[in-house]
Structure formats: C-alpha cells, structure tokens
C-alpha cells in the first residue's frame, strides 16, 4: 500500500516540476509535438504482483477481518472465564476439573476455540474462494495460521484475566489491548516507520505477528525461515498463560474478587 501512495506522490511532484519547462519550451525551440518525448523520455510502467488493479480490498479485507475478530475473541474469552467468578461458581468449576486449573481452562474454552476456528476458516473461504482475492500460498497454510492466531489470542486473554481476575476490570483492559493491537498491527501504517518504542511494543500483540505471517503467505510465500520468529511468538503467548494459571487458581479459591463490580 505504501508503494501506491509513494507512486501517486511522485506523479504529482513530477507534474509540478515540469510546469516551468512547459512554459519555456517554445523559447527553447521545442515544438508542441516534441514536448512529451522531451519532457518524459522514459515512462515508468508498474505491474503490482497479485493485485494488478490496485484494489484496496485485496490488501485490507483479510487483515481487517482478523483485527476486529481478535477483539471479539478477547472479550468472549475473558467473560467465559470471568463469569465463573462473577456468578460465584468457581469452586464447582474447579471441582469438576479435579482442582486442575489447566483442565478447567481448556474444558471451558475448547468449545469457543472450535467455534472461532470454524469462523476463521469460513472467513478465509469467503475471501479467497468466493471473493477471489488472490494469494500466493495454499489454502491450508492460511487456515493453520488463523487457528494458531485464535489460540494465541485466547491465551493472551487468559494471561490478562489472570493478572486482573475481576471481570469488571478486565473487560476494560482487553478492550484497550484489542484497540492497541488494531492500531499497531501494521495494516494501515507501516510499523517500521513508527517511533522505536512503539515499533517494539507492537510485537506484544498476537495480531501483529499474524499480520506479518499472513503478508508473507499472501504476497510471496517466501517460506518458514521468514516467519519462524512470528510463529514462535504466537506459541510464546500460550506459555505466558500457563505461567499464570496458578495465580488464577489462587484468585478463584480466595473469593476476594467476587464482590468487585
């Protein structure tokens, strides 16, 4: 997208810079028929890969869907877990999982994970199968990346809820995180052009890694060596959630967050 903006800007500057030459051309002995070749002896011709029509929907449809989808995943996940504390059913929840916090969280979130994954695959089918948005890779790499993104985003939601185990607080927190992720994912403004602290902060959001992986798959499919850092980062979000599960279990058993409104 930045290339198209730069090209349009250069075209405008070229037109403005040629205006004085056009005015002085008769005095220089250049005829009207010779002016085009005199002013522009070489004409550039651009052929964008995978998007020859320069249709912005090709660039924006897929990332924008998942940018907004991650907000829904965050909100639904924290509410699914937080409702156990809000409605004071945390003890029964843990007893059903035999006091194993990992089993309790997986059992609670697995139905949502399946639903979100189906929605992601269906969205990819609509965009790439029905709307015929061009892409450079196979269909399954896109779906596997979307599934990994769903699980990583849910893991981030579990991590945030473990830090703030009160649903009244964490709803606001994940809403802010979702908004920041949408801003810093690099879809509408290149992350490399942001201030250095903001640039590095963008990698704290799963959606940023998802966008980088997807751009590699859609516009070149350069292979795993170019995206292994992003894939590893998505798995790292799952480890963060696992680290704070004991704290979440303690918060549920303490009952001190049940009265926070």
Where are these regions (language model features)?
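Juxtamembrane loop-helix boundary motifs flanking transmembrane segments in multi-pass membrane proteins
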Residues: 36, 45, 49-53, 93-106, ...
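Hydrophobic alpha-helical transmembrane segments of multi-pass membrane transport proteins
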Residues: 50-127
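Transport-system extracytoplasmic interface segments
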Residues: 1-76
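Generic macromolecular interface patches on structured domains
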Residues: 15, 19, 26, 75, ...
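Short amphipathic alpha-helical interaction/hinge segments
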Residues: 20, 24, 73, 89, ...
């Amino acid at each position: 997208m930045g290339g198209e903006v730069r090209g349009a800007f250069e075209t405008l500057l070229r037109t403005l810079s040629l205006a004085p030459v056009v005015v002085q051309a008769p005095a220089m002995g250049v005829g009207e028929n010779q002016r085009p070749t005199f002013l522009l002896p070489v004409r550039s011709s651009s052929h964008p890969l995978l998007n020859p029509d320069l249709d912005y929907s090709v660039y924006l449809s897929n990332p924008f869907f998942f940018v907004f989808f991650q907000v829904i995943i965050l909100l639904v996940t924290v509410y699914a877990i937080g409702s156990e504390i809000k409605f004071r059913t945390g003890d029964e929840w843990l007893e059903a999982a035999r006091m194993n916090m990992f089993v309790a969280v997986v059992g609670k979130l697995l139905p949502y994970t399946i639903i979100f994954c189906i929605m992601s695959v269906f969205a990819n089918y609509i965009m790439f199968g029905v709307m015929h948005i061009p892409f450079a890779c196979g269909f399954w790499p896109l779906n596997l990346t979307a599934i990994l993104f769903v699980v990583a985003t849910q893991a981030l939601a579990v991590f945030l809820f473990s830090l703030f185990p009160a649903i009244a607080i964490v709803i606001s927190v994940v809403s802010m995180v979702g908004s920041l992720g949408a801003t810093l994912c690099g879809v509408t403004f290149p992350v490399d052009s942001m201030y250095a602290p903001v640039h590095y902060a963008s990698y704290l959001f799963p959606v940023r890694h998802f966008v980088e992986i997807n751009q590699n798959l859609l516009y070149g499919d350069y292979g795993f060596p170019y995206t292994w850092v992003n894939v590893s980062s998505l798995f790292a979000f799952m480890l963060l959630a696992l680290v704070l599960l004991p704290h979440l279990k303690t918060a549920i058993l303490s009952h001190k967050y049940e009265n926070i409104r």
